[in-house]
Swiss-Prot record:
Lineage: Bacteria, Pseudomonadati, Campylobacterota, Epsilonproteobacteria, Campylobacterales
Molecular function, one GO term: lyase activity
Gene3D superfamilies in alphabetical order: mk0293 like domain, Transcriptional regulatory protein pf0864 domain like
Family: Belongs to the LarC family.
Entry keywords, A to Z: Nickel
The name this protein goes by in its record: Putative nickel insertion protein
Keyword set includes tRNA processing: no
Superkingdom of origin organism: Bacteria
Alphabetized InterPro entries for the sequence: Ni_insertion
Amino acid sequence: MKILYYDCFSGISGDMHLGALVDLGVELEYLQKELAKLPLEGEYELSATTVSKSGIRATQVKVKLREHHHHDHRTFGNIRAMILSSALSLRIKERALKMFQKIAEAESRIHAKPLEQVAFHEVGAIDSIIDIVGSAIGLEALGVEKIYASRIELGGGFVRCAHGLLPVPAPATLEILQGLPIGLHGVPFEATTPTGAAILACNVDSFSGSLPLSPQKIGYGAGEREGVDIPNILRLILADEPVQPSPKEVLLETNIDDMSPEHLAYAVERLFEAGALDVYMTPITTKKNRLATKLSILSLLDKERELTQILFQETSSIGLRRLEVEKIALARRFIQVPTPWGEVSVKLSMQGEKVVRYKAEYEECRRLAMTHSVPLHTLYLAIDKAVESCLNDTNH
């Protein structure tokens, strides 16, 4: 499994994150091409340089603003409309908007303002829009299946912003990171910004200081701080996660011959809501040639008790069969493919490095088909051609 690990010993900011992504292999030209889909032409320049931090080579990404362009008070509504109206892929839009929403909600609570009216003094500035949307682009380009992170160093001291002098961590940063593992005063400056906090809060699947990793590539992104004891860098580790035994699963089954279809359907909904991995019904014939339904529930062991209780509450069953099972599954990863109507996410099923089958994300296809009034099968034919072309290019 391809994973990404954030080592946040010196915190994280938007520019550090972009630098680490570029250092890890996301092409700067690709970022520039994708970011050009936002209506910000002529307002900024994006550059990357190699620097040294405490003797460690790192990539520093900078967003240089054109002085005649200033929109420091864009609202969340303005930013959302900008992203939604762009030609970015659906997955990139969703990832970027999730991060902006997180920051907007934090600012809304802190300043007691309606969400849509929150003025993004810093996040609404062009450089922060580039940081967040660029992060979404870079993460999608890496195509990782899981994202993990260490404890997040926040720093200490004070920071000057649009609202005056504030203690570190800034209120928005702390609000965003509620419930997540943090460290305070490890460095005498603002180590983690609200943008960096949102990147972690919205994209990391799990926080852990120790993971069984097999590193494949390491990227270092440089911050602006100089002359500090701890290097002001973010370290990203692209790795393969060693194959772990899959969690034990249990198959619960019962035969039912005296319930209405409506009640059975409701029971299935309850089981899915409670965390069943799969629930399915099979028509069967029982003793005395009675027509019946076999209800099958696939569950993780830690959900078995709750699902069993729901089964007895919502069905007429007075007993069930139980069998522990193991699942074998192909590795999966996502790619973005172009069509005449927009980009679509496609899930590849892999055996080693070989793609054995692929499937487009249905909801994205449905939206494109409805938006552009194109037959769904026509869209799928275009996707087939795009995927085959992409795979042929990769093989060559």
